[in-house]
Every structure is written in C-alpha cells, then in structure tokens.
Amino acid sequence: MKFKNIFSITAIMAMLTINVACGGGSDDPEPTPTPPTPTVTAPTVLSTTPANGATDIATGSISVQVSYDKDVNMSNDPSLKPVISGGTLSGSASVSGKNLSFTVNCSDYETKVTVKIPKGLIGVTGALADEYSFSFTTKKKPEALNNDATALAKKLGWGWNLGNHFDTSSGQDGVPNQWGYWDNATPTQALYTNLKAAGVSTVRVCVTWGNYQTADPWTIDANYMAEVKQNVDWAEAAGLNVILNMHHDEYWQDIKQAASNNIINENVKDRIAKTWTQIAETFKDKGDFLFFESFNEVQDGNWGWGDNLTDGGKQYKTLNEWNQLVVNTIRATGGNNATRWIGVPAYASSPKFALEDGFVLPTDAANRVMVSVHFYDPNTFTLTPEDNGGKSEWGHTAASGKYQTGSNEEHVVETFQKLQEKYVANNIPVYIGEYGCVMHTTDRANLFRNYYLEYVCRAAHTYNLSLIHI
C-alpha cells in the first residue's frame, strides 16, 4: 500500500512536469507567430496615349492617358499634378482603375510637348510610382490655303448684322410685331454708306417673313418685300456685300414635330419652298454681291441640348432635307441665282454640330454652298452680364472663379482650326454669321470684353473665316 501511494505521487509529479514542459501552463503562453510581410511593388507604366515619341498629333485639346500595370490611386496633394512643357494642363487629372487621364492644350504646330508624372502623384498603398516622362509632337503647319473658300472669306471680310429690325417677330402669321421694329430705327442710304466708310464689307440682312404672310400660297406682303429690297439696294449702292436670310420663322418651322411627323414636315417644306421662291425671284438679277442664307438658328428650343441628342438624328436629317430644298428652290429660279453663293447652317448654327457627321451639305451642281455658323462661346461671358449670373472675365489672365473653364483662347483656336480643316481646306467657305459680347458692368470686365472680341477676330482671320458682328 505504501508503495502504491508513492507510485501515484510520482506519476502525478511526472505528468505535471510534462505539462509544464509542453507549455500547458496558463502563466507562460506560447507567442502567436508573426506572418511574413508581403512585398508591395510600385505601379509601373505600361503605355501612354499619345505614345512616347508620337508625331503628327492634332493641335488643340489633347486627351492624354497613362496606363499602369495595376489599379492605382492619385494623391490628394494639390501641389502634385502632371507637369507640362510645350503646352498647358487643362483642368484636373483623374484616375480610373489602371489609368491616369488629363487634357493638355497646345495650339501650336510642330511643338514638342513633354509630360512629367512626378513621384508621389500615383501609387498604391505602401508604394509610390516612380517619376515618369514622355513626349509627343504636334502636327506640321499646313500649307497656306489659296482657294475659292479663302478668296470668298476675303471678299466677305468683316461684317455687321442689320439685327432687331426685319427679324422682329410676333410669332404669328400675318401679324407684324405690335411694337414695330425692335431697334426703333429707320435705315437710310446713309447707314450703309457710313458702314462702308467704317471698314465694313458685308451686311447680313436678317428677315422674318412669316409675319407678312397669311395663308397658302404664302404670298409675302408686297410693301414688306419692297422695304427689304430697298435696303438691299442701298447696301449695293454703298459697295457692300449682302447676306439675305430667313430668320425668326422658327415659330412655323417646328423641327421637333416635323422630324417625327411626315405630314407636318411636308407642310413646312411646302411653305419653305413657296417663301424662298418669292425671295429668289425678287433678287435673281442681283449681282454676286448678294448671298442667300437658308435659315438662322433652327433648333427645338433647347439650343442643342434637347431631343436632338436622343432622337437618333431625326432633327439633323430634317434640317439637312430643308437645306437641300432651299438650294434646289433657289437654283430653279434661274438668272444669277443659278450660281449664287448660298449659306446653310447646321443645327442651331452651332460649330459643334457643323463638325459632326450628322450635318450633311446639300448637293449643288454649281458647287457654291457655304457653311454658316454662329459663335458665342462661352455664352456665360458673351450673352450674360455678371449682374445676371454671368462671368465677368475671359482668357488666360482671368482671375480664378471669374471665367468659364474650358472656353478660353484654346477653345477658340481649336474650334476655328477644325472648321478650316474640315471645310475651308476642302474649298468650302465658312462664315461666322453672328458673334459678339454684351457690355459688362465694370471697366475691368469690359477690358476682357474688348480682348475677347479682338481675339476672336484675329483667330477667324488666321483660319480663313469671315465674320459678322451681331
């Protein structure tokens, strides 16, 4: 029995010893192993757009993209941003997935643009991408143009709109505006003589015809037609060119309805043809100082931001159809109208739509069709004074917050350059039928106004566009 007790005590002591040796005691727990730290590699550049060393890149706003080998983040530090030489950074850079994107402005030909992505701008958690630089070169300066389109630009030169007069509209057939002409003025021969002496080459005579028509066959009031003709005669006597158009007749030219209803479209086309036949017959013996313009600013009331963006191009096709009808109608009257220059607008007379594929020039055996555009960019500066929520400054010296971003000098150059490349270089004249800027409320703001007007004029001249002040 004594031996048995000794054995039991010995066994218990051994078990305790084993337990302690195996770390089973709560006073001395085994530490948790630390997993190895994974290696974080910095993002590296796979490609750029434009590619490094690329040449013949179009001038203007250049979209740049830098693609990395993994999803990346961008620093919030405002001092870190792409560094550009040979151009300027427009707006802010952004990242999406593996791509860093931003816009570079460069309006100069044959210019090397170098882009540097500084270290610290791009990275992932735990690692920053190294600094990266690449460059590309803009296209060569095109040969100086010398064709019918540039010759016509010189002939039209700088002009003035006889606006707020014959374009006055009541919005009703047979009902002249109850307030009379909006300009409350009576043109005389002296007006046109003085315009010529001031350096004006062209007068755009804007006319609304529908207020002086009552019903089918849409005969234009004879006295009204005579008054319009008198002004054209005065301009001719002064040695001016004249662009005569159909202006605020949009109230019966409902392009949204016409684009979706063939009966309405046929009725509108019938009236367009009958109206333009009368105009063309009245002036068919006039010389080549006279130009016709099919329409003013045909649009659905939303100035290019309406149903035209979602209707599958129906409104654009309808306007193309109307422009073709006007050209055919004028040519059919014979006389000097067989070869008279005719201006046609794109949707809303917008350069944007004139540069898109939805705008199709009319076919013309005489090959004498011009493109008419209007330029009021940015309208927050040109059409809206600062006391009515507009911007007070414009251009590269404008103060932060006082100008419309994306619409400074680079935008003017890019727009006019594209018009020249698409049309003038292909012997199709382009004229800016309207441009201008409202008076602003401070001397400083009006200095920017003056700079804007001068810049637009100089740019138009550079790119062979004639222009007519509103």
Predicted regions and their residues:
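N-terminal carbohydrate-binding accessory modules
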Residues: 141-202, 422
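C-terminal motif of bacterial Sec signal peptides marking the signal peptidase cleavage site
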Residues: 18-21
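Short, surface-exposed alpha-helix to beta-strand junction/turn motifs within ectodomains of secreted
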Residues: 60-93, 119-122
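Conserved small/polar residues in nucleotide/adenosyl-binding loops
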Residues: 469-470
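Acidic, Ser/Thr/Gly/Pro-rich low-complexity segments and short DxT(G/T)-type signature motifs
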Residues: 31, 38-54, 79, 119-142
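Active-site region of glycoside hydrolase catalytic domains
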Residues: 270-408, 417-437, 462-465
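An active-site-proximal structural segment forming one wall of the substrate-binding cleft
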Residues: 185-187, 192-200, 220-246, 256-294, ...
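Acidic/histidine-rich helix-loop elements
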Residues: 163-187, 215-220, 264, 380-411
